[in-house]
Amino acid sequence: MLAAGRGKRAGSLQKNPKQYRLLGQKPVICHTVRCFCQHPAITTIILVIHPEDRQICEQAITDFKEHLIIVEGGNTRQISTLRGLHALKKFKPKYVHIHDGARPFIENKLLEKIHTTVNHQEGVLPVLPVSDTLKRVNSTHRVLETIPHTHLYSAQTPQCFPFERILAAHERAMQTCKKEFTDDSAIAEWFGIPMHTIPGDSHNIKITWHEDFDTAHLYLKKKMQMFPDIRTGNGYDVHSFEEGTSLILCGIKIPFHKKLKGHSDADVAFHALTDALLATQGAGDIGTHFLPSDPQWKNAPSEIFLRHALEIIKQAGGRIANVDITLIAETPKIGPYRHTMTENLMNILSLSLDRISIKATTNEKLGFIGREEGIAALATATVLYPGEIPK
């Protein structure tokens, strides 16, 4: 993702380059990064920035730091792209998207079309037909000729390529060609990589001029009026006590004169949370994926089940917004361990502290919980998925 430009054509009273200016409540680059982070097929993101922008960049992408590798670019787009490709090389990707950081409105359906079209021989280029009449003018602004726009298209990004081929193309161009290429498909054409075009998206604008911010703000406002696909799942689990020396809650070992009875480690909190996460995909419950009768799960850590649910969500392009767990028990006391439990969930879920709630209550001495025969857990999870709620 290229974000090393200075954005001088965009003009502004603000001192920051266009990719760091606010679009709504977030910088432009934040919107762009989010589009790729939400797609399950994107495994690594290299963000190429201007050497002077590291501090402002890190502030802008706080929400996505764990998803990005920052690389400093060069004096030209071509040099910056090559540095990004070199940084990506160690990950041995099969394909690579090359995208302008100032295009913040990439839709999931465009990425899907690119992924189903690209192959090991050809690159993929989203394009839009040119509709305006084109004129060639001279230095004094006199019209020289009218250019027929039949078969003329404007190129967009992301452009997708077989990684090794586009890397070789950029390296060859840097070594032997003095021509300055304006996009990566031009380098691919020069190198002999066939480019397959697909229909682009008229909303996938590149913010180049100051007026483009007005267009972007209007489109963002329209998008915010859509109904986002936000799903909530609930989970419930209960385990009885048996003789033991400790029990596991939220992955944390708690010294106690009893343990929770179960086929796995009987982590009642993780079981409830796993079911809540699975519910956002209509994916059944833990027992659907991990049969209680299967000996391989005997005494297994419940984090395995939780991470399985996380992978299902990731494959669907989901992002967890928050989780809430309520433990219902007369004993042991949960308070002394709540902070450690929360930290463990922060690491597993990659969520900040304010997006995780763990609390405990008693059952006021009523029922089996009141008789100190076991522990119950309730969990709620909110997950955001790409797209809108179907009409």
Curated annotation (Swiss-Prot):
Site-annotated residues for Transition state stabilizer: R9, K18, H263, T362
Pfam families: IspD, YgbB
EC nos: 2.7.7.60, 4.6.1.12
Positions MEP for the nucleophilic attack, annotated site positions: H149, K206
Gene Ontology MF term list: 2-C-methyl-D-erythritol 2,4-cyclodiphosphate synthase activity; 2-C-methyl-D-erythritol 4-phosphate cytidylyltransferase activity; metal ion binding
Region annotation (2-C-methyl-D-erythritol 2,4-cyclodiphosphate synthase) ranges: 231-391
Residues holding 4-CDP-2-C-methyl-D-erythritol 2-phosphate: D237, V238, H239, H263, S264, D285, I286, G287, T361, T362, N363, E364, F368, R371
UniProt cross-references to CDD domains, sorted A to Z: CDP-ME_synthetase (cd02516), MECDP_synthase (cd00554)
PROSITE patterns per UniProt: ISPF
Superkingdom per UniProt: Bacteria
Reactions the enzyme catalyzes: 2-C-methyl-D-erythritol 4-phosphate + CTP + H(+) = 4-CDP-2-C-methyl-D-erythritol + diphosphate; 4-CDP-2-C-methyl-D-erythritol 2-phosphate = 2-C-methyl-D-erythritol 2,4-cyclic diphosphate + CMP
UniProt entry keywords in alphabetical sequence: Isoprene biosynthesis, Lyase, Metal-binding, Multifunctional enzyme, Nucleotidyltransferase, Transferase
SUPFAM superfamilies xrefs: IpsF-like, Nucleotide-diphospho-sugar transferases
Gene Ontology biological process terms in this record: isopentenyl diphosphate biosynthetic process, methylerythritol 4-phosphate pathway; terpenoid biosynthetic process
InterPro entries reported for this sequence: IspD, IspD/F, IspD/TarI, MECDP_synthase, MECDP_synthase_CS, MECDP_synthase_sf, Nucleotide-diphossugar_trans
Residues annotated as binding a divalent metal cation: D237, H239, H271
Role: Bifunctional enzyme that catalyzes the formation of 4-diphosphocytidyl-2-C-methyl-D-erythritol from CTP and 2-C-methyl-D-erythritol 4-phosphate (MEP) (IspD), and catalyzes the conversion of 4-diphosphocytidyl-2-C-methyl-D-erythritol 2-phosphate (CDP-ME2P) to 2-C-methyl-D-erythritol 2,4-cyclodiphosphate (ME-CPP) with a corresponding release of cytidine 5-monophosphate (CMP) (IspF).
Entry protein name: Bifunctional enzyme IspD/IspF
Taxonomic source organism: Bartonella quintana (strain Toulouse) (Rochalimaea quintana)
